[in-house]
């Protein structure tokens, strides 16, 4: 990296002035201005000349330019039309970058991968995710039939800790279950808010999620499974039996059946959702077949 890199206060301010760019809080725009942090993200992603990269929210291209130097191809989704001419400028030296001016949650990511990254040996998502939609983005990408091998993503520290949380902790919840289901998760580093322009209100964290060859547990309907696990955390102070009364149709009239279903799965109805492992949740879900009265 050198003095011309985008991820410096001087270069970022110069670009802001050149394009008279104003940050939009509604889009969670906070541009990274520390080349050392970017290098650590690159190192953690293990990308090389055979790797295709999906980036979400490239901003002015501070991370994108470094991805382009190391990866075979980069596809970056940017929702803000105002940043497209900026990116055309900052990334003009790289013919292996495709910028798509679309909302990642509405874009046809499958088609984009087939069109631009089909000749890559592996695909990684490497991004400084917009904080306001971090969870929807991850859930959306994980649940699609995409050949993504892993993710190295920066996000709000609180959300990152939920992804990597252990059973029984305050951070452990439905998002922890989804992440654990699809990936092996680890923390890369904590990032202070001072290395962004403008600085966000909270510190950030970089998390690495590597896709499992197969989900850690077997369930026949992932959407319903995640709906069931989410309900277990709907009111964290309540027991799992009480939370599930709100999930099932006529649940309050089926207290005894819910209790029997839980006990049949080896779960004490007085336990709270945060004490159950993903394997225990999967066992409960698969055990629902024996209790046709319990529908949701």
UniProtKB/Swiss-Prot annotation:
GO MF, one example: 16S rRNA (adenine(1518)-N(6)/adenine(1519)-N(6))-dimethyltransferase activity
Cellular compartment(s): Cytoplasm
Transmembrane segments: none
Keyword Protein biosynthesis: no
Superkingdom in the source lineage: Bacteria
Similarity-based family: Belongs to the class I-like SAM-binding methyltransferase superfamily. rRNA adenine N(6)-methyltransferase family. RsmA subfamily.
Job description of the protein: Specifically dimethylates two adjacent adenosines (A1518 and A1519) in the loop of a conserved hairpin near the 3'-end of 16S rRNA in the 30S particle. May play a critical role in biogenesis of 30S subunits.
Xref: PANTHER family: DIMETHYLADENOSINE TRANSFERASE, DIMETHYLADENOSINE TRANSFERASE-RELATED
Protein name per UniProt: Ribosomal RNA small subunit methyltransferase A
Name of the gene this protein is made from: rsmA
